[in-house]
A protein has these predicted regions:
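N-terminal regions that are enriched for targeting/export leaders
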Residues: 22-82
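Beta-sheet entry/capping signal
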Residues: 82, 91, 118-120, 335-337, ...
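Short, flexible loop/turn elements at secondary-structure junctions
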Residues: 82, 87, 96-99, 120-127, ...
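Predominantly the structural core of cysteine protease catalytic domains
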Residues: 127-393
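Active-site nucleophilic cysteine motif
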Residues: 87-101, 158-165, 385-386
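Active-site-surrounding "flap" and adjacent substrate/cofactor-binding loops of secreted or lumenal enzymes
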Residues: 69, 105-136
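Bacterial Sec-dependent N-terminal signal peptides
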Residues: 1-23
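Conserved small/polar residues in nucleotide/adenosyl-binding loops
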Residues: 402-404
């Protein structure tokens, strides 16, 4: 019986192999001949091949017609002082959200310089995300490992990326501290190694929690074990980022940089005085996604920073209306949290983001014709980097260029 079964399997595999070879859909010799004709090997083809084979494609595609001088005048601008630097980390969302608040603080108090600690909220963000993962594992413990939600959790146990919703959720719960109270570390400026180690530990813990649940552990036991696990994650975060302060002294300076007063604060009292305590109610997230219906609110489950926080939630609007709101926000002296697909057409040497920066079509001898809707539908484009929109230049009431 066993030999017969094996013979059937072998025969079926052989038949499938023959059908695959003889069936339509593969590249036949005739088709390959037609395909090869697309490269003629002309002098122009050879020159392009030599150039592309020995150079960075991006440099060759740099559009010289778009290299004229840049006009740095902006008709509407929110003033700020200094530049904050996320270094080699994915904390753009956090720096951007804090910069929106920082501009208001600089304007209100007339400080020469001022910066919130980005490490402080990032510490709590990572701990909260670890809890989000572990609790998500507990919630889905009855589902198989092949379940889509379970797969997503194990694929995304921890990230240093985020959205403005995360800024609001973390800051409203833990408060803020000045830069000096919790300064940058090597791990905060270069997050990948720390994130990889914590993610590896979380995945290990996730499997342990699933095993406990499968063995019949009660919710109280799972909660207790999760708390112990988070203790290990907390220690790892302290080793990498430092101990978050619970109270501190802050020396306030006047507009000339002279010390005026030493204030004693907790993170929540510092938020109360120098930050925006209405982050959860004063702001909404807007999105332009032409692949989905406009004038509707969308929510992405588990894409949040706290288990008890708010999912990434946004109102989908035509881009023209979002531009109008951006102008209104800047006219109201409020910078705007802004994100888009940055990497493809950013000329970092000039500090210019323009779809005309690189002419890949002329270089490759073909067109890239998908519109925004099609690029989103095919996962070819998406929001990749958050920035603070601080100025625009208007041309007949429309945005001609922007400063971020």
């Amino acid at each position: 019986m066993k030999k017969r079964f094996l013979s059937v399997i072998v025969l079926s595999a052989a038949l499938f192999s023959v059908q695959a070879q003889e069936g339509k859909g593969g590249i036949s010799p005739e088709m390959l001949g037609q395909i090869k004709q697309s490269y003629q090997g002309t002098a122009a083809d050879k020159a392009l091949r030599n150039a592309i084979g020995n150079n960075d494609i991006r440099k060759l595609a740099l559009n010289q017609e778009n290299m004229q001088g840049m006009d740095t005048h902006f008709s509407i601008k929110v003033e700020s002082k200094g530049i904050t630097d996320q270094k080699s980390s994915g904390r753009c969302w956090l720096f951007t959200g804090l910069n929106v608040m920082r501009a208001k603080t600089l304007a209100e108090y007339g400080f020469q310089s001022f910066e919130f600690s980005e490490v402080y909220p990032f510490f709590w963000d990572q701990l909260e995300k670890a809890n989000l993962f572990l609790q998500g594992i507990i919630d889905t413990s009855k589902s198989p490992l092949t379940d889509k939600t379970v797969e997503w959790l194990f694929q995304h146990p921890l990230s240093d990326g985020g959205t403005f919703t995360g800024v609001a959720d973390i800051v409203s719960k833990y408060g803020l501290v000045p830069k000096d109270a919790m300064p940058e570390t090597n791990s905060s400026e270069n997050t990948s190694r720390m994130a990889n180690l914590i993610s590896l530990k979380l995945k290990e813990y996730g499997l342990q929690l699933r095993d406990m649940a499968a063995a019949g552990a009660k919710p109280e036991a799972l909660e207790k074990e999760k708390t112990t696990m988070l203790g290990t994650i907390y220690r790892m975060l302290v080793l990498n980022l430092g101990v978050p302060p619970t109270e501190f002294d802050y020396v306030r300076h006047d507009a000339k940089g002279n010390p005026v007063e030493t204030e004693h604060h907790t993170p929540m009292s510092f938020l109360e005085k120098y930050g925006d305590k209405q982050l959860l109610t004063n702001y909404v997230m807007l999105m332009n996604d032409p692949s989905r219906e406009y004038y509707k609110c969308y929510e992405i489950d588990y894409d949040r920073h706290r288990y008890d926080g708010k999912n990434w939630t946004y109102v989908n609007l035509p881009v023209e209306e979002i531009k109008e709101m951006a102008i209104a926000s800047l006219k109201d002296s409020t910078m705007m949290y802004f994100s888009c697909d940055v990497g493809k057409f950013l000329n970092s040497e000039r500090g210019l983001l323009d779809v005309k920066n690189y002419d890949y079509e002329s270089l490759m001898g073909t067109t890239f014709g998908m519109d925004k809707k099609q690029r989103i539908q095919t996962f070819s484009s998406g929001s990749s980097h958050a920035m603070t929109l601080m100025a625009v230049d208007l041309n007949k009431d429309e945005i001609g260029r922007a400063h971020v």
